Amino acid sequence: MPEIEIAAGSGDNNDALFGKYELGKLLGCGAFAKVFHARDRRTGQSVAVKILNKKKLLTNPALANNIKREISIMRRLSHPNIVKLHEVMATKSKIFFAMEFVKGGELFNKISKHGRLSEDLSRRYFQQLISAVGYCHARGVYHRDLKPENLLIDENGNLKVSDFGLSALTDQIRPDGLLHTLCGTPAYVAPEILSKKGYEGAKVDVWSCGIVLFVLVAGYLPFNDPNVMNMYKKIYKGEYRFPRWMSPDLKRFVSRLLDINPETRITIDEILKDPWFVRGGFKQIKFHDDEIEDQKVESSLEAVKSLNAFDLISYSSGLDLSGLFAGCSNSSGESERFLSEKSPEMLAEEVEGFAREENLRMKKKKEEEYGFEMEGQNGKFGIGICISRLNDLLVVVEARRRGGDGDCYKEMWNGKLRVQLIRVCDQTSSTNAAI
């Protein structure tokens, strides 16, 4: 197996990744990533380091989007039953995730080795799963790929949800209020996804939770067939059989989870009140921390200071992942980013007005709501502008040279458009921070 290129950071700790993480044994390997056990030199704690080949990702836009989505989602989640993402780092060729190390491994392996679990243990894991899933839903995150392979067990026997690469955010919901992307593993796919008419992420996750619970107690999948189309037919019709050892209460509960009609399928709130679920005592879950979520940041300076590293990483000049996220690289090497308190809409209007005044050819990028490509007469220079919301208070403006003459680019960007945008930002804003 080829060695992973180790990139040391500043300092004398050249035998450690970025001078921070000492890599140990290989935990897993895939087509685009390897996961190593590692030790954090600063704390002595074990971590898992996922290493991805950026070049390979750039040849697979869908996977690159999954990685971007995973960073975006995991940095906003903090829950005892969700794997914690500590840090994201990068070199020119690789991306590194430093994550919580979950010693017990996959729940899937536990079932494969030891067979089905008792109802009591299954209930405990399921309660923790619902705690994590409900927490995600309360924050507009839908996992869409819940299965035992993505559920880990720590040394204390607690469940941890991982792998948010296929997750959806509320801003991916179309005007009809539904998601439309075909995601998930075949045996866990909800029937409404197969209809391709759109679906609600929360209800799809509940279905997958039902499949997981069935597998925990039965030791096998409710819908299984060597022929995938036959399996889909069974899912669509809800054709499955309970094992004889399932209790009547559990059969009733699973039937509500695996209701093929999403409109009548049990909800998270209803799950929390179900007799089978609460048996043995269960602490009521509070999915929203009102004290934290009601706090308001008083100024943009405070907001800049408190920004999570995962918010800034794709804009940082030292660890620039924006080439990966945009699916292309910046061959000219000229780019600049700054923060603004103005709305993306207002800044976009300024950019469009500037293009008209300067007689520049401009087109909007399909993949970005506020992304523009501008080109001077005869192709003398090209500028790419991306305006994206960073959080509730701040917006990032990014400019990149897209070929052409460097002096013309500097004249247009540094001498004109940048000045105009910053002037607009300064009209009512006290803060304008460069990144």
Swiss-Prot record:
Residues 21-277 form the Protein kinase domain. Induction: Up-regulated by salt, drought, abscisic acid and glucose, but not by cold. Residues 302-326 form the NAF domain. Expressed in roots and stems, but barely detectable in flowers and siliques. Its cofactor is Mn(2+); Mg(2+). InterPro entries: Kinase-like_dom_sf (IPR011009), NAF/FISL_domain (IPR018451), NAF_dom (IPR004041), Prot_kinase_dom (IPR000719), Protein_kinase_ATP_BS (IPR017441), Ser/Thr_kinase_AS (IPR008271). One of its GO terms (biological process) is signal transduction. It is an enzyme of class 2 (transferase). The keyword Kinase applies. It catalyses: L-seryl-[protein] + ATP = O-phospho-L-seryl-[protein] + ADP + H(+); L-threonyl-[protein] + ATP = O-phospho-L-threonyl-[protein] + ADP + H(+). Its EC number is 2.7.11.1. The activation loop within the kinase domain is the target of phosphorylation/activation by upstream protein kinases. The PPI motif mediates the interaction with the ABI (abscisic acid-insensitive) phosphatases. PANTHER family: CALCIUM/CALMODULIN-DEPENDENT PROTEIN KINASE KINASE-RELATED, CBL-INTERACTING SERINE_THREONINE-PROTEIN KINASE 11. This is CBL-interacting serine/threonine-protein kinase 11. It comes from Arabidopsis thaliana (Mouse-ear cress). The gene is CIPK11.
